[in-house]
Structures are given as structure tokens and as C-alpha cells.
Curated annotation (Swiss-Prot):
This is Isoprenyl transferase. Catalyzes the condensation of isopentenyl diphosphate (IPP) with allylic pyrophosphates generating different type of terpenoids. Belongs to the UPP synthase family. InterPro entries: UPP_synth-like, UPP_synth-like_CS, UPP_synth-like_sf. It comes from Rickettsia sibirica (strain ATCC VR-151 / 246). GO terms for molecular function: ditrans,polycis-polyprenyl diphosphate synthase [(2E,6E)-farnesyl diphosphate specific] activity; magnesium ion binding. Binds 2 magnesium ions per subunit. Keywords: Magnesium, Metal-binding, Transferase.
């Protein structure tokens, strides 16, 4: 049992994992997507209300068209093959990011998944796709200014984010052996505890998740206070 309300994961290391195993980048990304399916039972067992996965950043658009096209295709395949199982297990799906950059057919697929699962309450699985936190904050401020407000409060920004109901991040996990948060949930993770692992995401397993949570449980959170 854990008191974590929001677990965020940067799914890093797919391409390096592929290089290590003499595989293509596409095979590495597929292994990363398969890992979500593998870890779903653990996510459900932990009963953490909100889990956000960083799957495709706003910066990822700058990669080769072949890699970008495959990553977009992976999201479509994942929603197509996993949606019924997610729905059956009571998972509410949310997707955040600049989704207008995606094709109309994929946007429709995303909206259908959100609509189908909107009343589920076991856990919320939020997929951050075409997402950048700076962009999210800019979009929120633009929305507020467009509404006619001349002064902006914390509350105004919170309510203008892609998902106003998203709780603050308690624990942010990044596999892959690098130590940065890469423009991910900067607003929501203001007081998050950070956990970094040298293991690549496709090698990550439920015991690694548990190890991160155990490490988190030993920390004394101060939320910027003493």
C-alpha cells in the first residue's frame, strides 16, 4: 500500500536499449510500448489513483520522419489493441499534449478512448503525447488572456492546463541513466520526489517500480518548507 496519489514516469532508453541488443529504434520503441502492457497489472495492484506516462515529447517532432511516424503509429496500435482490456480493468484514459498536431483520425481514436473510459474509477492512465510542459503553460496563459483576464493567479493556470483535474506529482521516475526531467510536468511536479534508474525502460519491471516506491517512502517531504 502506498500514499502516492500521482506517479509520473519518463519512459526513457528505448533507442539505447535497441542499440544494446542490435535492434532497430522501432523495435526498441515497440518494446517500450509492450512494457506498459506488462506493468499494467502492477499499476492496478498498487492502486495509485493517477499515473502519467511520457510517451512522446514536443521535442520528439524533430526526430526523423520515419521514427516520428512509427511512434505515432504505436499510439494508434496501443489504443486499438489495449483499449478493451484497459476499460475492463476500470482504467480511465486521458491524453494530454498538443493533440491538434496529430491526424484527425488519431484525434478521433483518442477521443473515443477518453469517452469510453470516462466513468471508470480504478486508476487514471494519462498518456502525455506531443507534450511539452513549457508549451502547456504557454497554452494555459494564452487561454486565460483570451478569456479577458488581466491578472493571472496560480488557480487560473491550474484550471487552464490540459487536465485541470490532474493532481500534483508525488513521485517522478526516470529510467534510462540520465538525470533530467526534460520539459515534463514542470507545473505539476513542482514538489515531486525524483527517482532515477540506470536501467532502460524496456528492462524496467515491477520490482524496479517497487524499489522506487520504497525509496520514496523513506523520504521526508517538505514541499519547499523546512
Amino acid at each position: 500500500m502506498t500514499n502516492i496519489k500521482h506517479l509520473a514516469i519518463i519512459m526513457d532508453g528505448n533507442a539505447r536499449w535497441a542499440d544494446q541488443h542490435n535492434l532497430t529504434k522501432s523495435e526498441g520503441h515497440k518494446a517500450g510500448a509492450d512494457k506498459i502492457r506488462e506493468l499494467l497489472p502492477e499499476f492496478l495492484n498498487l492502486n495509485i489513483p493517477y499515473i502519467t506516462l511520457y510517451t512522446f515529447s514536443s521535442e520528439n517532432w524533430q526526430r526523423s520522419s520515419t521514427e516520428v511516424d512509427f511512434l505515432i503509429k504505436l499510439l494508434s496500435i496501443y489504443l486499438k489493441t489495449e483499449l478493451n482490456n484497459l476499460h475492463k480493468n476500470g482504467v480511465k484514459i486521458k491524453v494530454i499534449g498538443r493533440l491538434t498536431l496529430l491526424s484527425s483520425s488519431l484525434q478521433k481514436q483518442i477521443n473515443n478512448a477518453i469517452e469510453l473510459t470516462k466513468n471508470n474509477n480504478k486508476i487514471t492512465l494519462c498518456i502525455a503525447f506531443s507534450y511539452g510542459s513549457r508549451q502547456e503553460i504557454v497554452d494555459a496563459c494564452t487561454k486565460i488572456i483570451t478569456s479577458g483576464k488581466k491578472a493571472v493567479s496560480d488557480s487560473d493556470i491550474q484550471h487552464a492546463l490540459y487536465d485541470p483535474e490532474m493532481p500534483d506529482v508525488d513521485l517522478l521516475i526516470r529510467p534510462g541513466g540520465v538525470y533530467r526531467i526534460s520539459n515534463f510536468l514542470l507545473w505539476q511536479a513542482a514538489y515531486a520526489e525524483l527517482y532515477f534508474s540506470p536501467k532502460y525502460w524496456p528492462d524496467f519491471n515491477k520490482y524496479d517500480i517497487q524499489e522506487a516506491i520504497n525509496d520514496y517512502s523513506k523520504r521526508k517531504r517538505t514541499f519547499g518548507k523546512r
